[in-house]
Amino acid sequence: LYTDILKFDSRNPEWDGRDRFILSKGHAGASVYAAIAENGFFDVAELKTHYANGSRLSGHVSHHVPGIDFSTGSLGHGLPVATGRALAAKQNGKLYRSFVVMGDGECNEGSVWEAAEFANHYKLDNLVAIVDHNHMQSLDYCNNTLEVDMAKRWEGFGWNVIEVDGHNHDELRNALNDTSNSEHKPTVVIAHTVKGKGISFMEMDILWHYRFPHDGWEYNCAVNELHKTKPEGVVDPYTPNGCPEKEEKPE
């Protein structure tokens, strides 16, 4: 989004012509903070204050941070707000688009489908939802809570549906660029993802939905495996001297 899709000006975060972006799954705020810091909204060094007492980089995204359009955390609110902003753009003759990233578990919220129906009725082709379809929510797998065919549900609400591998940047980029051909429909990009991707002992394990790795084997193994996914030449500011030595898992 921040490298190829969104229109924004980090020197003027409130620029009226910017595209609007809402991270509805606000608990994933660390990823957005990293992206906007790298794009000049604030100093990258401030990322080290994330979650610290008194830091503006709270666990859920806050509009007090430059580049954040809407505070989120209470699920089910992002799409309704993005829908309202898309309608406002249409009514005011503005060319900006509204983007919202949501979780698949979040799609259990009734407010999501009220907004989806509204967006279809008003032909909001300047609205793009991205659903992180990792099949997990809170403390269980999505299908154990409410089994839904995600693509068919959105199609039933009249949306233009695109499905992609959420770990493939080219597929994501192409899908988001294709939304301009949506025939006066809002677009949803369903990004199929793997929770804990790249870390062998975390992938698709519900245990890790609310856990963080402890010091020692868990942390060192996770960092080592993540480094294997890092593009060559990219420097990690948190481990500038390389990752810790891999350890054997304790018995």
Task: Enumerate the language-model features and the residues they cover.
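Short acidic, glycine/serine/threonine-rich loops at helix termini
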Residues: 33-35, 62, 111-113, 139-143, ...
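Glycine-rich beta-alpha junction loops
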Residues: 27-28, 32, 134-135, 168, ...
